[in-house]
Amino acid sequence: MHADLAATTSREDFRLLAAEHRVVPVTRKVLADSETPLSAYRKLAANRPGTFLLESAENGRSWSRWSFIGAGAPTALTVREGQAVWLGAVPKDAPTGGDPLRALQVTLELLATADRQSEPGLPPLSGGMVGFFAYDMVRRLERLPERAVDDLCLPDMLLLLATDVAAVDHHEGTITLIANAVNWNGTDERVDWAYDDAVARLDVMTAALGQPLPSTVATFSRPEPRHRAQRTVEEYGAIVEYLVDQIAAGEAFQVVPSQRFEMDTDVDPIDVYRILRVTNPSPYMYLLQVPNSDGAVDFSIVGSSPEALVTVHEGWATTHPIAGTRWRGRTDDEDVLLEKELLADDKERAEHLMLVDLGRNDLGRVCTPGTVRVEDYSHIERYSHVMHLVSTVTGKLGEGRTALDAVTACFPAGTLSGAPKVRAMELIEEVEKTRRGLYGGVVGYLDFAGNADFAIAIRTALMRNGTAYVQAGGGVVADSNGSYEYNEARNKARAVLNAIAAAETLAAPGANRSGC
């Protein structure tokens, strides 16, 4: 690794930016063409609470340009007993208590950075609020019945205030280290100290990247995962039959029930991520170490999601409805035949159109009238194991609307609830035993420049106290079959369950697996 030890942001530029903004990123670019995102994560974050790794594989194959590592978060905003709570330092004037969504929006406004034109060359994510919204956050947006048991007691949201970030540029072979200087007390008394502190944190990150790691080369096998299903095939079939009856009665067009699968495991979450990265690369790959109030890891989130809820970039909101699926073929010729079959399937296309309309309606709530449009309607995208029908819906955020407004307008995804959305969620509450928690929520970020990118939390494991929780479901329509839907949910969960089972077998080459 080679580093230019001078910070890219000069003290003079920092003073100018700090006069108008309470968060100023101080950066340093290092040559790191022999590092991988995983090795950089191990060096910079080392599985500490409040750290993360975010990556993307385009169409399940080639890796996107950027990977992001969260190396430090001095505080996090979460929810306790319905109230906004900070786990750590509280930025001056940031709300404590009250509506957590309002507290989040006020915090984003207080800590807004200069726009990208004022700071050219910054990576797409340089700092912000990174974390998750659980599915049950919807109870703050819609009035739903309260029947499902809250057995995991997860917070409705937790977002890290990510101050120390490393952006891995796969095209250049460089890593941009970012230490965000945060003005915690809202005064200009300690500007030079804040700059010096940011440079010192850059020094710590630079030194960490220069340290060697033990070899992580490993072999693995793919055993059958030992897991427990929340429902039997008969029980799940009865749920599907009930929902089909409700659809026939005109209560909904589609409902998306799900069930949870559990697996006992003490495997390191980073090893599960490593396996997912190989076996199920997806547009949204993530590893988060979620802290508790004691500063320890409460639980880990490991995921490989194919689908965004919404992205916001420079005032434009975009969502990509996905509905319609075929498994990938064994050859390119088989893929072409399966694509033609999917494009000719009237049922799949009708479901896709319904979700596109839902996406248009969601964005229409927060976008300037006349700007919402559908692009690339119903085209095929191939992923590592499946292909989907995908469309793009985009719109310009209205005056006074924010990235958080776009997230809440689209939340939860129609692909995880159904249509009409509120009635579908009411029916879900009738048939699911336990609250969904993370499943059907989102994982991603709201940055300090007003942008956002959130993945739908599917193909995701929540790992806590020796148990991994994986949840999956599928859309039920008028002619759905119970046993088919049960197998569909199980197959969707298997990508992650298989990764956990494989991670348990990781061993150095030549190691004796039997222990003899």
Curated annotation (Swiss-Prot):
> According to the lineage, what is the superkingdom?
Bacteria
Any GO BP annotation: L-tryptophan biosynthetic process
Alphabetical list of PANTHER family matching this protein? AMINOBENZOATE/ANTHRANILATE SYNTHASE, ANTHRANILATE SYNTHASE COMPONENT 1
Task: Kindly indicate whether the keyword Ligase belongs to this entry.
Answer: no
**The protein's Enzyme Commission number:** 4.1.3.27
Family membership noted in the UniProt record: Belongs to the anthranilate synthase component I family.
Keywords from the UniProt entry:
Amino-acid biosynthesis, Aromatic amino acid biosynthesis, Lyase, Magnesium, Metal-binding, Tryptophan biosynthesis
Tell me if Lyase is a UniProt keyword of this record. yes
The protein's enzyme class: lyase
**Protein name, please?**
Anthranilate synthase component 1
What does the protein in this record do?
Part of a heterotetrameric complex that catalyzes the two-step biosynthesis of anthranilate, an intermediate in the biosynthesis of L-tryptophan. In the first step, the glutamine-binding beta subunit (TrpG) of anthranilate synthase (AS) provides the glutamine amidotransferase activity which generates ammonia as a substrate that, along with chorismate, is used in the second step, catalyzed by the large alpha subunit of AS (TrpE) to produce anthranilate. In the absence of TrpG, TrpE can synthesize anthranilate directly from chorismate and high concentrations of ammonia.
Q: Which of this chain's residues are annotated to bind L-tryptophan?
A: 56, 283-285
- Species: Mycobacterium tuberculosis (strain CDC 1551 / Oshkosh)
Q: In which pathway does it act?
A: Amino-acid biosynthesis; L-tryptophan biosynthesis; L-tryptophan from chorismate: step 1/5
